């Protein structure tokens, strides 16, 4: 049997209504003053105040920082770190989707060790434990509550940098499915397909193991069978619970098996054009699934049966059937048809022409090749291959 190592050094609560357990968990952490890092949407909905009130019920003070954008920047990390230091907080509550989670992890590093988040770019540059962190996701999702990554946009380089260190794993995670029912359909779709892609890329990764495969398979089954239902009705608590659990399993799976070309290529798209992360992944997925089909050794059939309403048997299955099923799923949940549409949907300055996009393909490919995920993609890729895949996605 193949040998492998794994460790999941976190305390994870998965329970409907478990936001109410925040005071108990904060007490376990020994915290007396929290900085809640969240987004403006949750603040407007009163959920940030609800979390702060829970903490106040056990005499834990809470300050808040909610000025967080999609694809959060180095500047946002600097502002949030300043807020943490000025407030006198001694732990962080990351409350929201992937953006608040990424910022909270980065703040936990910089507040403890100083400098800029850029000083910790790359693998294993965080010298030790960070500020204690409780993660409460409100999307399903990034899986950030169980991953050792923080992704931050450096606008000076049009580049999404990654901090990778097991030191930045949250000590505690609270997964309350009631929280994800507040997401708009577009957010539920983008986050849900992102979670599915985490599992899919981990599953076909050359670094996959029996452990990561088991988690990825369960994640794909949960998400694939529920994502249409959840996007159509976010108040469907059964579907919400399945999506949240699937996202959790996918996050753990890719923490061990890494990802692939989809994530390597989507980060530059978000850095150059501010396309939401999940949307960028989704429009690239069918193109890259087709490219990787030559390297399939039977796993595509499993993936297909997780997302297709009509199952297939091995003797009738062709890998291109999965590509078609992915396109059908993305259309059903409202994902843009191609990269050109996705970029224009995200544009704040008017129409972005195909020529303008094509002018960025080479620098995007250069940045994509810097990602460690390229190395574990099931089919080897050169820069010219990445450029070709971007063009196919247009």
Identify the role of each PLM range.
Residues 1-29:
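N-terminal amphipathic/basic leader segments beginning at the initiator methionine
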Residues 19-22, 44-47, 74-75, 99-104, ...:
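Short glycine/serine/threonine-rich phosphate/pyrophosphate-binding segments
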Residues 20-35, 54-58, 86:
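Glycine-rich phosphate/diphosphate-binding loops that line cofactor/substrate pockets in enzymes
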Residues 43-115, 229-240:
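N-terminal small/polar loop signature for handling phosphorylated ligands or for N-terminal nucleophile
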Residues 112-208, 299-302, 306:
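A glycine/threonine-rich phosphate-anchoring loop and its flanking beta-alpha core
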Residues 202-328:
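Active-site segments that bind and position negatively charged phosphate/pyrophosphate groups
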Residues 308-394:
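C-terminal charged capping/lid subdomain of soluble metabolic enzymes
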């Amino acid at each position: 049997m193949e040998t492998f190592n794994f460790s999941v050094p976190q305390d994870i609560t998965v329970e409907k209504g478990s936001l109410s357990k925040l005071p108990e968990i904060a007490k376990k952490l020994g915290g007396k003053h929290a900085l809640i890092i969240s987004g403006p949407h949750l603040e407007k909905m009163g959920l940030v105040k609800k979390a702060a009130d829970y903490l106040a019920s056990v005499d834990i003070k809470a300050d808040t920082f909610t000025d967080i954008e999609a694809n959060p920047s180095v500047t946002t990390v600097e502002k949030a770190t300043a807020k943490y230091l000025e407030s006198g907080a001694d732990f962080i509550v990351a409350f929201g989707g992937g953006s608040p989670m990424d910022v909270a992890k980065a703040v936990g590093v910089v507040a403890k060790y100083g400098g800029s988040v850029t000083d910790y770019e790359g693998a294993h540059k965080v010298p030790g434990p960070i500020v204690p962190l409780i993660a409460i996701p409100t999307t399903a999702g990034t899986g950030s509550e169980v991953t050792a990554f923080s992704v931050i946009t450096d606008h000076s380089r049009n580049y999404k940098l990654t901090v990778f260190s097991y030191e930045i794993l949250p000590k505690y995670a609270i997964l309350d499915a009631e929280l994800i029912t507040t997401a708009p359909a577009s957010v539920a779709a983008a986050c849900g397909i992102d979670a599915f892609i985490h599992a899919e890329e981990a599953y076909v990764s050359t670094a996959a193991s029996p452990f990561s495969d088991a988690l990825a398979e369960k994640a794909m089954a949960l998400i694939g069978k529920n994502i249409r239902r959840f996007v159509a009705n976010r108040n469907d608590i059964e579907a919400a619970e399945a999506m949240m659990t699937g996202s959790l399993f996918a996050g753990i799976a890719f923490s061990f098996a890494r990802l692939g070309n989809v994530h390597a290529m989507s980060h530059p798209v978000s850095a150059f054009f501010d396309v939401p992360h999940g949307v960028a992944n989704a429009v690239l997925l069918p193109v890259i699934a087709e490219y990787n089909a030559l390297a399939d050794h039977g796993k595509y059939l499993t993936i297909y049966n997780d997302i297709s309403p009509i199952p297939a048997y091995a003797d009738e299955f062709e890998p291109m059937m999965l590509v078609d099923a992915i396109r059908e799923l993305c259309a059903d949940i409202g994902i843009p048809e191609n990269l050109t549409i996705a970029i224009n949907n995200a544009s704040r300055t008017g129409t972005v022409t195909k020529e303008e996009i094509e002018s960025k393909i080479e620098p995007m490919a250069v940045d994509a090749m810097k990602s460690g995920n390229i190395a574990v993609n099931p089919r080897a890729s050169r820069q010219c291959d990445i450029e070709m895949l971007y063009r196919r996605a247009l």
